[in-house]
Amino acid sequence: LPAAAIAADSTASATMHVSLEVVKSCTLKANDLNFSRHGSDESSEIQAKTQVDIVCTNGTPFTLTATSNDGENGTFWLKPENGDTGAQKIAWKLFADEGKQTQITGTNGLDDTGNGAEQEETLYGVIDAGALTTAQAGTYSDDITLKLEY
């Protein structure tokens, strides 16, 4: 046989499996909630709102809840920043809607489903009407923990 006939091009092939697992994940960014300034003669309900930014894997259901060291589920307490332990604390609550239908507590909260993009959710803080009547002058604050379960 001529040498040119033996040097023919040859090929081989194989199948390669490629895989990827996308796991569910979420991130949460919270902004501060500020009730602003009010006199102790404020007789109407006080509302303030803020946003939280949530990013969850597309199709991932999540629940946003809130807890505090105050020990009560759903009622949080603004405490004097000057450390006066004898001063009145001011009760407040957190809601997922302006109409106050969905309260955010340690066991119940805002339910939604992630879409893979940032979802801005508005939260509403509420102080009941007349709650400042016996409050001492000063700055009050509270720290709560927002938890995203998914």
Predicted regions and their residues:
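Gram-negative bacterial Sec-dependent N-terminal signal peptides
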Residues: 1-6
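N-terminal small/polar-rich segments of proteins
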Residues: 7-84, 108-150
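Residues that form or immediately flank small-molecule/cofactor binding pockets and catalytic motifs
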Residues: 40, 97-99
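Short acidic/polar mixed-charge low-complexity motifs
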Residues: 60, 86-88, 100
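Predominantly extracellular/luminal cell-surface or secreted proteins
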Residues: 67-69, 93-97
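Extracellular/luminal ectodomains and secreted, surface-exposed scaffolds of diverse proteins
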Residues: 76-77, 88-94, 102
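Surface-exposed loop/edge segments in extracytoplasmic proteins
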Residues: 100-106
